[in-house]
Amino acid sequence: MPRYLLEHSHTAAECGAVFAAFNAFDSPLRHQPTTASCHYGGHRIWWEVDAATEEEALGRLPRYVAARTTATRVRPTEIP
């Protein structure tokens, strides 16, 4: 199954709306740990998801969040 890195970006003013968007959206990403920089003023969130397509990967996010998110296909890589 392909893996995608979802990178979401928002402003400080949008931060609350981004997290609130998940309350009314059934997503397997809810209540799961991920990496975010909001606490430090960066206002970016990253998720790694397994999905058949980029569209399927973005479909795991509420529309409001997905519209501000890029999906990049990735794979584990060992750095020599």
Where are these regions (language model features)?
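Conserved, structured core segments of small domains
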Residues: 1-80
